[in-house]
Amino acid sequence: MKKNLLILVTSTILLSMGVGLTYGGPIKIGICQIVEHPALDAVRNGVIESLSDAGYKEGSDVIYLIANAQGDMGTALSIAQNFKAQNVDLVVAIATPTAQATAEVFRGSATPIVFSAVTDPIATGLVLSADDPSGNGNITGVSDLIDVASDLRLLKELDSSIKRIGMVYNPGEANSNRLTEIAVAKAGEMGLSIVKAMADSTANVSIAAQSLIGRVDAIYVTTDNTVVSAIDAVVAAAEEAGILYLQADPTSLKFGPTIATGFDYYQQGILTGNVVAEILTGKKPNEIPVTYQSGAQVHLNLDAADKIGFVFPQSVIEKAASILYGGIVWEREETE
């Protein structure tokens, strides 16, 4: 097993409240994420909080095995194999690469798998159908499929002169490949073009981002785990070029992109925890349809915009869920 395999074992009480499955001892739940960054950390925390809110209290009735693959697919496979060797009762796999590794290792097993923050579970072969996951293993979960077309329209709304959009992505991530394909198709319909810059590791993100300088009018990064883990490199390239940078991850706003869009990943974790609770109380994964999170929001970074001399249109400011200004994130107050 690789040295960078990190497993932290903690314990929590999981009360079955007299219904559902009966376990001969503490329930063991393996939770693995592909890398450490705020969005995936928020998912993990949301899962645990959801179970707590459902009445599953901390103690000795459940053991969480929490692991981080540090961006390495081989390590993700090793983690899944370790979970299997420890006879976990359920696995929560956070992000597409982790879910793929877990599904491969547990293929043919009765151990339930619940994925989270997976872009396209059908295209990546995790399930055969969103409404009926049966037929492809003991797996279901929650997707964070983003609206790529909406993001591209937002860039055009921000600056009508934008024609070429650079996308930094890891071709080794199935989720990124899928979203890049969608972006190319949607951009063509809008009179835009996509310029690809590939980075197969965090070490290569800077080179990929720098290659876009002078070639594009804006940068767009989707839910790519590799690139988000090296977001500073993309921010630096966008600032040097003096162009907008839209990141499809709200948790990344404070790190410097001009715009961040997408879902509340803590809520993604809450939804995932709800699925886990259903399974622990007796439902089979193939009886639970895949959940697609809704309610994507727009977040603006005025500090980043100031650095490139950009002023947000009032129409966009009015629909922003939050604005970062003066180093402080200002949340929009909800009105009845």
Describe every region a protein language model picked out.
Residues 2-9, 18-336:
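Short hydrophobic alpha-helices and adjacent helix-cap/hinge residues
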